[in-house]
Swiss-Prot record:
Presence of keyword Ribosomal protein: no
Subcellular location: Cytoplasm
Subunit relationships: Homodimer.
Catalytic activity annotation: guanosine(37) in tRNA + S-adenosyl-L-methionine = N(1)-methylguanosine(37) in tRNA + S-adenosyl-L-homocysteine + H(+)
EC number: 2.1.1.228
Protein name: tRNA (guanine-N(1)-)-methyltransferase
Role summary: Specifically methylates guanosine-37 in various tRNAs.
An individual GO BP term: tRNA N1-guanine methylation
Length: 235
C-alpha cells in the first residue's frame, strides 16, 4: 500500500479533490492510505500559535521550528524510513519521473507550508526533499501536495484499468515527450475531419504517425524535453 502522511494547519482541506474520480476510488479500495496531521496540535500556547515574525524584519510570518519540528518527529516516531517532502516554490520542479520514484516508497510525508514558509532550521535539521509544482506562488502547500498525490496515485497498480492510458500519455509516451493528438467519433465535426491514417487500420502506420506528431508538438511547445531535460531527477 502507498502510505501518505500530510502535515498541515488546514487538515480540513484533505482529501479535497483526491476524494473524487480515480484517486477517491483507490482510497476506498485501500490501494493507498491518507493520514492528515494538524500541525497546530503541537503548538506551545493556548492560542495554538504556529508562526511568528521573521528575525531581521521583513513581510509576513514564518512557521516556528519548534512547532513544526515536533509535528515531524511525531511522524518519524512511527515511520522512521518515510520519504520526507516539503512543498516550496524554491524546490525541484516536480515531473512524471519524480512521481514514478515516489510511488516506490512505502511511506511519504508531505509538509505543507503557509505564510512566508518555514524556519530554515527545520530544513537544516531534517533535509527534506524540497519540491515545487511550478514557478508561481500558492497560498500554501496543500494544493501542491494534492497535485503530487493525484499524479502518484494514478500510477499505482489497480488504479487505472487500462495501463496503456498511462504509458501513452504525455511525459510517459516515447521517452518523455508530449502526447500525440487524440480523436473520437464523429469522423467529421464542423469543418474538421479525423486524420485518414487513424481510420486505416494499419497499426504500424498509426504508431509511426503518433510518434511523429508527438515529436512535432514537443518541438513546438516544449523543445527542452527533446534535449533530455525530462529524466530521473530524483535524489
Amino acid at each position: 500500500m502507498f502510505d501518505v502522511t500530510i502535515l498541515t494547519i488546514f487538515p480540513e482541506m484533505f482529501p479535497g479533490f483526491l476524494n473524487y474520480s480515480l484517486a477517491g476510488k483507490a482510497l476506498e479500495k485501500k490501494i493507498w492510505n491518507l493520514q492528515v496531521i494538524n500541525i497546530r496540535f503541537f503548538a506551545k500556547d493556548r492560542h495554538l500559535t504556529v508562526d511568528h515574525i521573521p528575525y531581521g524584519g521583513g513581510a509576513g510570518m514564518i512557521m516556528r521550528p519548534d512547532v513544526v519540528g515536533d509535528a515531524v518527529d511525531s511522524v518519524l516516531s512511527t515511520h522512521k524510513d518515510t520519504k520526507f517532502i516539503y512543498m516550496t516554490p524554491s524546490g525541484t520542479k516536480f515531473d512524471q519521473s519524480i512521481a514514478r520514484e515516489l510511488v516506490g516508497f512505502p511511506h511519504i510525508t508531505i509538509l505543507c507550508g503557509r505564510f512566508e514558509g518555514i524556519d530554515q532550521r527545520v530544513i537544516d535539521e531534517y533535509t527534506p526533499y524540497e519540491l515545487s509544482i511550478g514557478d508561481y506562488i500558492l497560498s500554501g502547500g496543500e494544493p501542491a501536495a494534492m497535485v503530487i498525490l493525484d499524479v502518484c496515485v494514478r500510477l499505482l497498480p489497480g488504479v487505472v484499468n487500462n495501463s496503456g492510458s498511462i504509458t501513452e500519455e504525455s511525459f510517459s509516451y516515447s521517452g518523455g515527450v508530449l502526447e500525440y493528438p487524440q480523436y473520437t467519433r464523429p469522423k467529421q465535426w464542423r469543418k474538421h475531419r479525423v486524420p485518414k491514417i487513424l481510420l486505416s487500420g494499419n497499426h504500424k502506420k498509426i504508431s509511426d504517425w503518433r510518434q511523429k506528431q508527438s515529436q512535432v508538438i514537443t518541438k513546438r511547445r516544449r523543445p527542452e524535453l527533446l534535449d533530455g531535460e525530462i529524466n530521473d531527477k530524483f535524489t
